[in-house]
Structures are given as C-alpha cells and as structure tokens.
A protein has these predicted regions:
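Short, charged/polar N-terminal "headpieces" of proteins
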Residues: 1-23
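Intrinsically disordered, low-complexity boundary segments flanking structured domains
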Residues: 1-2, 25-27, 72-73
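Generic structural "secondary-structure junction" signal
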Residues: 6, 40, 47, 53, ...
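Short, charged low-complexity linear motifs
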Residues: 10-12, 49, 59-60
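Generic structural signal for residues positioned in beta-strands
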Residues: 11-13, 28, 37, 85
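A short, structured beta-strand/loop element
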Residues: 19-54
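C-terminal structural segments of small proteins and small subunits
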Residues: 58-89
Length: 90
C-alpha cells in the first residue's frame, strides 16, 4: 500500500485502486495501531473510536490542505500509475 505521507506519528496511505470497486476517493491512516478511513472531502468513512481525536483533527486539516494532490494520486493509482509523496503537516 503506497505511503503518501507521515507526520506526528500518523501514516497516511492510499490503496492502488486499479480495477477496484471503491467509488469514493479516500485515504487510510494509522496511528499507534489504530486505523481510520477518511474521504478526500473529510468525511470519516470507517469510524474508529480509538483513533485519537486530536490526530483525526490533524489528518482532516492535512487532507484539506492537500486535497488537489490527494485527488491526483487517487487518479494515478486508479490507472495503475506511480503515485507521488505529499508533504507532511508542519
């Protein structure tokens, strides 16, 4: 699974969707073994009550800042092409 970015202990990744069944562009994130799925519009698609709220807020801010880059990566991965890394939250 391609890792797009890492910041403050959060690992953000996106699956290769070539021929996949997912319709909603989204990212996966992991922090201390807890995972969450977030649409590129900021909606939590697979809630995880153990994912820290402060880390979720950071993830939401990062997603908003990098929405265009995330959408471009979604398109690239959907076509089976190489993705690019995205700057971390600073």
């Amino acid at each position: 699974m391609p890792t797009l970015s890492m910041f403050y202990g959060i690992i953000v990744y996106m699956y290769n969707e070539k021929g996949g069944k997912h319709n909603t562009p989204h990212i996966h994130a992991e922090y201390s073994g807890e995972e969450i799925v977030l649409s590129l519009n900021g909606e939590v698609l697979e809630p995880n009550s153990k994912f820290p709220k402060n880390k979720l807020k950071m993830l939401e801010v990062w997603t908003d800042i990098h929405k265009e880059e995330l959408q471009a990566n979604w398109q690239l991965l959907s076509r089976g092409e190489k993705y690019f890394r995205i700057d971390p939250l600073k």
